[in-house]
């Protein structure tokens, strides 16, 4: 429960309160006592004792007409019968009010937050596995792939980083379930849309940066994308950063100026990988030793080193780190299947140019025969990826490419595929039925020298079409049908 008086006080302290509007009158303080038993931004979940948040560009006055709620919070006075708390920024208001309503669960958990263009989910699973070794399985996880609030039962995530109200409720639920640690991914959109406003993480990790999510509905420029991701830095008590990433200099400069304790990793840093072979690697630095992971690729080993440094800052021992990394399984990340003819099928969530480039390089290094790539791209977001995908394909002439449907949303998947193909000088194949495209690629393999890469969807069991998630068999189940 939270009182209206408390809500107003929170908003005033954050310089986010304008007035209360009711029946044509304005109030700086409400004359009566009001208690809210619930917070919601979903009208379907609102009751007479709910404080409702009217947010979003598409919110309409008629949504409030028959709404059952006590008050609503908004940046706009809709002049309806329901009294309104008018604010400057409704998303910031929701974040701070939710934190108070759920009694600041973020302060009772040890939190590790990861950002970066690629590798967040893999690193999140690495970190959870390590911390589970340390705390006996008491680590909650919020990732792009899955969420668990009790360390054991998983469900599909809706967003990389949940809305602030949902996030604080999840944190409270994790505490109720006996969790002591939380690992979560923090997207650039989370900072742009204030989903993590007011939160300070015990450890923040910045894995890498490359152009992605650039488009009219996400970030207008690379600068905006990078700036939003960089907000994790000043909202972390300890920070781990990749010294080899683009634009690292400003990260180092800001960390030093803000006097935030930190660790860097990379070839020219104190913490580095000095030997790498297959699934095995050796590190030097503050976490020095031999490690094994279940994923191929130097980039996965670098992510493992980043999470080793981050979890060490939370108290993990060398053995916790070694055992955790060795046991970590990441759904939809370099999942490996073997066809009857010996060909390998790699299923991976790689959904931007940098992650696809790294994936292709790893597979090329391990297969001398034919390489097949099944790939699509998202609709109505991340439009810059299409050029990036085209450039990866162009730079790897060994790839036999079948362009298909990803989450096309409200765009024509053939139009998306054509745009990818426009950046490639050689002929590509098209098959918009994703399952049939997978079947087609596998059928073309001949022996163990050959490989198929199925990129973009990972473990997703849906396809986004016309704004709705439609059931999809999943890349791995589809591939298994045709082995």
UniProtKB/Swiss-Prot annotation:
One of its GO terms (biological process) is cell wall organization. Belongs to the MurCDEF family. MurE subfamily. It is found in: Cytoplasm. InterPro entries: Mur-like_cat_sf, Mur_ligase_C, Mur_ligase_C_dom_sf, Mur_ligase_cen, MurE/MurF_N, UDP-N-AcMur-Glu-dNH2Pim_ligase. NCBIfam families: murE, PRK00139.2-5, PRK14022.1. Keywords: ATP-binding, Cell cycle, Cell division, Cell shape, Cell wall biogenesis/degradation, Cytoplasm, Ligase, Nucleotide-binding, Peptidoglycan synthesis. Its EC number is 6.3.2.-. It holds the Pfam family Mur_ligase_M. GO terms for molecular function: acid-amino acid ligase activity; ATP binding; magnesium ion binding. One of its GO terms (cellular component) is cytoplasm. Coiled coil: none annotated. Carboxylation is probably crucial for Mg(2+) binding and, consequently, for the gamma-phosphate positioning of ATP. The keyword Secreted does not apply. PANTHER family: MUR LIGASE FAMILY MEMBER (PTHR23135), UDP-N-ACETYLMURAMOYL-L-ALANYL-D-GLUTAMATE--2,6-DIAMINOPIMELATE LIGASE MURE HOMOLOG, CHLOROPLASTIC (PTHR23135:SF4). Pathway: Cell wall biogenesis; peptidoglycan biosynthesis. It is an enzyme of class 6 (ligase). This is UDP-N-acetylmuramyl-tripeptide synthetase. The keyword Protein biosynthesis does not apply. The modification N6-carboxylysine is found at residue 229. UDP-N-acetyl-alpha-D-muramoyl-L-alanyl-D-glutamate binds at residues 43, 160-161, 187, 195. Catalyzes the addition of an amino acid to the nucleotide precursor UDP-N-acetylmuramoyl-L-alanyl-D-glutamate (UMAG) in the biosynthesis of bacterial cell-wall peptidoglycan. ATP binds at residues 116-122.
